[in-house]
């Protein structure tokens, strides 16, 4: 195969991979989101791309991220649960003996992630059962401070999960976030409400300020 100066650069590294709900780089500001600002302005930045509005929204975008394939508009991620998903990041990491985890700060059952994500190669956990049996699936829950908040806090998700893997020598972790979920206002969006003061002085519409606040 073709090789260049980057070939093998990250061999042996650990990987934390995120799909960010409803996210746009418009939300990144050095003063309000310094960590995100650092992430997108250092290392490798890939900006020659476009993102269509997938018919099944979050699930199709997640399917593209996790598989590198184009969805067919019929809940491709859900359907992948019965397919042979041999060429995914967790499959490659697992081949090197790395334990692969996935987390989502909503329900286990939404979009049938409790079926699709283990089929990708992840040990998948969420904060709520979503109608699944506690006896069968209760071990797949992790704890956050405000599990009933909508949208739930990505920060609390990190607090509740990092301890499961951070001391491992090797790990691959995937996060499906939810903090940036619509609607963008200060009444129906808990994340926006919690961070309202941080954006109060911005000369923007309420929707724009609420969007920045929840991200």
Predicted regions and their residues:
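Solvent-exposed soluble domains appended to multi-pass membrane proteins
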Residues: 2-215
């Amino acid at each position: 195969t073709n090789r260049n100066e980057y070939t093998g650069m990250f061999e042996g590294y650990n990987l934390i991979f995120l799909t960010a709900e409803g996210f746009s780089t418009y939300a990144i500001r050095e003063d309000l989101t310094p960590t995100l600002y650092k992430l997108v302005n250092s290392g490798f930045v890939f900006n020659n791309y476009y993102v269509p509005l997938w018919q099944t929204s979050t699930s199709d975008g997640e399917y593209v991220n996790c598989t590198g394939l184009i969805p067919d508009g019929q809940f491709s991620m859900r359907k992948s649960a019965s397919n042979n998903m041999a060429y995914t990041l967790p499959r490659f990491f697992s081949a090197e003996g790395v334990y692969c985890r996935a987390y989502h700060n909503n329900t286990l059952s939404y979009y049938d992630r409790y079926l699709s994500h283990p089929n990708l190669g992840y040990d998948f956990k969420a904060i709520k059962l979503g109608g699944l049996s506690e006896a069968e699936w209760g071990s797949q829950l992790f704890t956050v401070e405000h599990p009933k908040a909508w949208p739930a806090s990505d920060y609390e998700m990190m607090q509740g999960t990092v301890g499961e893997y951070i001391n491992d020598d090797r790990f691959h972790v995937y996060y499906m976030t939810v903090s940036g979920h619509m609607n963008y206002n200060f009444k129906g969006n808990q994340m926006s409400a919690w961070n309202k003061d941080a954006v109060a002085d911005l000369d923007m519409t309420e929707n724009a300020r609420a969007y920045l606040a929840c991200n």
